[in-house]
Amino acid sequence: RDRCYVICPQNAKRLRDDTPSAKGFIDRGDEVYASVAPSYIANYKGINIEIMRSALKKLGFKDAGETAIGATIVKREYEKLIENRKQSVIISSCCHSVNTLIQKHYPDVLPYLANVISPMQAHGQLIKNQHPGAKVVFIGPCISKKDEVDKYPDYVDCALTFDELNDWMAESGVEFDFSQEDMTGGGRARWFPTRGGIIESMDIDDDFSYFSVDGIEDCMNALEDIRDG
């Protein structure tokens, strides 16, 4: 999706800005919680989750947490699938674009795709269970999350990109307060958005071989190899 947006020669692709939706939830008095992708640490130099939480509260959010909380739930589900040993091949992907690629162009390998929700969905579900009636806004780098929200609306109510958050903060005069210390610690689930991060976060079973694939071309090659046996 990002590629289509960048290269479209007619400039026909337009990103949907979900900031008005997020603002609307806040303005009408909903309790709004932010699920922040762990890649924020790469997007914002010197930022930790406490600094991010403080800024988001100034915008009107009730609270904010890392999507990595959901990733911890997801990685446990992956480990259960491996422990059950019902599948000899398991495709794990938290990337909505890759999952859509499989559904549209590689339906033959769909049985191998782990039936596990994404970290964003898991975190959203957890927040909504803990705070009935709350709205959840995902904040991250990927525009395909907007489509994921549309397809699975029970978990998260809208998705913002970091660019949209930047514009909202600038418009509202909100800046990061770098005096906030991160008291949450790390956790292996923060590795999820990195290359091979899902595998790095898991407890490895020596009876299985683990491979990580990055990039659309390599993903397609790997899917074709699985399809062809």
How does the language model describe each region?
Residues 16-229:
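Iron-sulfur-associated redox domains of electron-transfer enzymes in respiratory
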Residues 1-19:
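Iron-sulfur cluster-binding cysteine motifs and their immediate structural context
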